[in-house]
Amino acid sequence: MIYQVTALVILAVFYGCYFLKMLMQQRKGIRTDQIGQGKVGFVKFVEVTMKIATLLVPAAEVISILLNTTCFWAPFRICGAVIGALGATVFVTSVVTMRDSWRAGVSKTDKTELVADGIYQISRNPAFLGFDLVYIGILLMFFNPWLLIASVFAMLMFHLQIVNVEEDFLLETFGQEYLAYKKKVNRYIGRK
């Protein structure tokens, strides 16, 4: 029962932050969810598939938590709880640091700034890192084949979004400023 409660708290903090930030930005007239909007070809495919994956994972997570599925011993589950809590913390920190520049997907029409301070000094993609850590944490706590497939698929789609959509957008939008930042900070974690 303790693992189930812990996992539900992690998910409540994680998804609560996501939806609260979207609501706060909506009140300012900012449309946060840009996934697939105005996109064509491979970019649209990546963004729409990523969105589907991010809808499948929470469903698989909640079902796994409610059924208390796992084949792992307690140390793995405890490690999963720590990783999941770290992921939620990283995600919340990234969203707060981004201020009003945070978007789900990219928008070529919104005026945003390149955020390179705070947690962005050690990760160019801390929000995606937070997603990955939460997914890995919950997976370790409630391992089952369906959750594994959904989580790995979503993490793969996040990576494709970063590499094929976001990095190109940031280079096009911020040019040399982004290149200088990219030379200093790793995609997921660490400085160069």
What are these regions (language model features)?
Residues 1-109, 113, 134-169, 173-192:
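Membrane-anchoring alpha-helices and their flanking helix-loop junctions
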Residues 107-128:
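Active-site-proximal inter-transmembrane loops
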